[in-house]
Amino acid sequence: MKELQTVLKNHFAIEFTDKNLLETAFTHTSYANEHRLLKISHNERLEFLGDAVLQLLISEYLYKKYPKKPEGDLSKLRAMIVREESLAGFARDCQFDQFIKLGKGEEKSGGRNRDTILGDAFEAFLGALLLDKDVAKVKEFIYQVMIPKVEAGEFEMITDYKTHLQELLQVNGDVAIRYQVISETGPAHDKVFDVEVLVEGKSIGQGQGRSKKLAEQEAAKNAVEKGLDSCI
């Protein structure tokens, strides 16, 4: 945990008073289960707490940032920001993936790169930070790590292209729409996916992203921007 403490101190000006709390935040259930005799705590309860404070702070930010957006739009945007895939991305940005304690089986099966484990650890860290410090420190961290990407429009950009494309294509009846990965490049922790969207077997758009879902949205956007004439 010393390396993690160094990362937190150097990059985020965070120093935990309760080191055990920090360690618990990065302990997956699989690790605790493999060391039952040691009665090690895992991070599920902290994840529960972190999820709650994250929802609150992101809701407050969006409410103040977008005074004219209706509740439905705010809810959709919040959902995009706090979804599993997004939180996993933030965890990787913070190098948290390097410090999660996993059981041998989970490690061998690729758990260190699994979005659900990374997202849970990110929320657990927020919960631990809340308990060790206060909500103001959690807010400071969120505004340093998450909000810049929100303000860059990363989450609004991907909100609805797949749905929009589906609505355009299926206005006159059902149409078979399929997304497929063309290629994957880069190391496991920083992959780039190339995806194409096909309608009735015909490729109508391509996109690239750091996850399959982001690449699919880019492919749908590409198809929408081309216009329906090229899609059918």
UniProtKB/Swiss-Prot annotation:
Protein encoded by which gene: rnc
Domain DRBM: residue ranges: 160-229
Family in the record: Belongs to the ribonuclease III family.
Biological source species: Streptococcus pneumoniae (strain Taiwan19F-14)
Amino-acid positions noted as binding Mg(2+) in the UniProt annotation, renumbered to this chain: 47, 120, 123
Entry keyword annotation includes Cytoplasm: yes
CDD domains xref list: DSRM_RNAse_III_family, RIBOc
Known partners and oligomeric status: Homodimer.
Protein name per Swiss-Prot or TrEMBL: Ribonuclease 3
Cellular localization per UniProt: Cytoplasm
